[in-house]
């Protein structure tokens, strides 16, 4: 007869007949559960901080897989001391992780409208994590179900195993590839590997289920909020190359899969965990050999300092250059001081063949004041960009700067409709004629009774031409859904715009100011860069270079501009296109097709960027199949999660007559 397992707690009938014993045991049980719940929630909060650390400007890409791993560990059973949490607790754990991430990631929302919108949006975004947490609990249970079925052992082996408990225990601590456990039935050898169930429900199920939840968050309601996608935190790591295959969706799945691998390592299943964790970044890193960044630029920076700041400005200019200038080993940096204006010039030139290259100039005119009220000085903003362009024209005339093919102004660089205001029209025309090349102007237009956020091509000879009306509008900013309802919570709803979306593919054709050739430019205005459809439609429409005109002045010195820049970098890699970011107050940037930033400005400064960039008509795998890959992975995640939940339904008891 096998030796019965000693009971650590009294039987229910013993507790029932012992005064106070049952209550004491129950209170101890509740205390232990509460303690482990607090530990799990604390671990989830730290996981949220790790995920936040992966986003720009922090750029700690490896922190995201670590954060996902900590979240999965918080949802796992911790031996006999703390069994796996239920679905409700799992949902709360994931909600905690999401809330901490978004509270740290989105404070720019409330920069000038108060903390209520920031906190409310963070809570709404974290609500989607409830589904991920509950689903992951079911997936983990289904994955570990096979491990609960232990093999039978003979009584003789059982007694032998019990009599040699100390020896077996010491043997199991020597790092072998298997684990010897003692149970009431004897010694059981548990191999350090993962079962087919675990591979399906954990390695495949958890990453794809995460993507499915992220997909819902990015599309619903009001068009979704794609700003919080996990992939945006991977632009500084090797996983970025996966964008050319499956876009942000594949990067998200790869990131979560690495987190699953780290969680498996935590369970001391070494080899499978290491393989899952390392194979993805290694393969992605090797894929960079297939990524063509285009010609290597040699860079020149020329700083022009304000008249009233001779010494102080020159010191600041040197510091600014150190931060703004990013170049490869072949780059050279040349600094010159001039007192002709307060504009900082950055130029990236190329000495290779001019074939399929285009020269672009970006004007960052800055805004007269920080905050929402800068729109009250609409003409001052327009004047800033006109004056900066006139300064550029003088440099071109004096052969200090190369003549560009076209110039890009930011979103809202003219908050006055030039089609209705003759003075605004004259100022833009003056700038275009002085530069002698077309300008992409971000402005407001009013077709019919609508108001639209527009980027229009302004030719020095023919005036306004093709235009892109912003398709993906920012809810609660550019338009206000349910305005009457939300007015009960904040009076700031009346500050939201009333824009109407456009319906074009985002491609405008710009006549080169040097060759007269038409250049197809894909435009993604500000918020649009976060959405897959914006540049996807532009590439399908023949865009050979991207531009992202944006207005971030409302968000001050927060991380918003750097977060948006990360999205532009990922889009460059995804579609193999150079991207020009033009911001009213920064950060403006030149992005190579490999996602590398060759030049950028600082926030709330005046500056001009020059760059010679490649035009490309080839298409990546992602441009054909990213949508199909995303839908397939999302569908797989939903099916596997539902299968895990259904497989654990408790059988109904049949009442005996």
Residue ranges: model-predicted function:
Residues 80, 140, 267, 397-400, ...:
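Residue-level signal for alpha-helix termini/capping positions
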Residues 205, 442, 458, 591-592:
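Short hydrophobic alpha-helical segments used for membrane anchoring or interfacial signaling
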Residues 109-116, 143, 182, 218-246, ...:
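Active-site catalytic loop in hydrolytic enzyme cores
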Residues 653-657:
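Cytoplasmic C-terminal tails of single-pass
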Residues 2-168, 173-311, 328, 338, ...:
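Membrane-embedded alpha-helical bundles of multi-pass enzymes
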Residues 112, 116, 125-129, 152-155, ...:
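CN hydrolase (nitrilase-like) catalytic-core segments centered on the catalytic cysteine
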Residues 57-72, 101-104, 364-365, 401-416, ...:
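Short, conserved active-site loops that position catalytic residues or coordinate cofactors/metal ions
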Residues 288-312, 317, 321-476, 497, ...:
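Soluble catalytic regions of membrane-associated enzymes that act on cell-envelope
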